[in-house]
Amino acid sequence: MDVSMTSTLFKPYTMGDLELSNRVAMAPMTRCRADQAHVPTDIMATYYGTRASAGLLITEGTAPDANGAGYARIPGIWSDAQVEAWKPVTKAVNDAGGKIAIQLMHTGRVSHQLNMPEGATVIAPSAVALPGK
């Protein structure tokens, strides 16, 4: 890689009020490390905190509602417990000098009822389920 390219990559970047320490972004990766109630865990704070040298971290897909939590152990933000559990994650990233943003993910027809919280319903624009398991 050209030296001028790498020197630009690692320079701070500002867009509006957002100031990043560099121009590196970590793309979201669904890791399924939340607990059974879709509450973020300590291991998630450690994972994201150790990657905070990227200018911007984008979290794994996070369900905004129980009806969108179609994968087991993906984090959510629909309960007070989930919102509170995200605070140590964001603190770990911010304390290490990084910035973090959430990727909202509603699984729609990819959902499987067995992976959803009790009482949740598959909601999607189509009643046709995806083929396969």
Where are these predicted regions, by residue range?
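Active-site mouth loops of central-metabolism enzymes
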Residues: M29-I43, Y71-D80, R109-Q113
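A cross-domain feature marking catalytic cores of carbohydrate-active enzymes
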Residues: P28, G61, L104-H106
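Alpha-helix-loop-beta-strand connector modules within alpha/beta enzyme cores
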Residues: I74-A101
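Non-globular sequence segments
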Residues: M105-K133
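An N-cap/entry alpha-helix motif that binds or orients negatively charged groups
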Residues: M1-G16, V24, P28-T46
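Structural preference for beta-strand elements that scaffold enzyme active sites
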Residues: R23-A25, L56-I58, K99-A101
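Conserved, mostly hydrophobic/aromatic
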Residues: M26, R51, V93, I102
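Catalytic domains of carbohydrate-active enzymes, especially glycoside hydrolases
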Residues: M44-D65
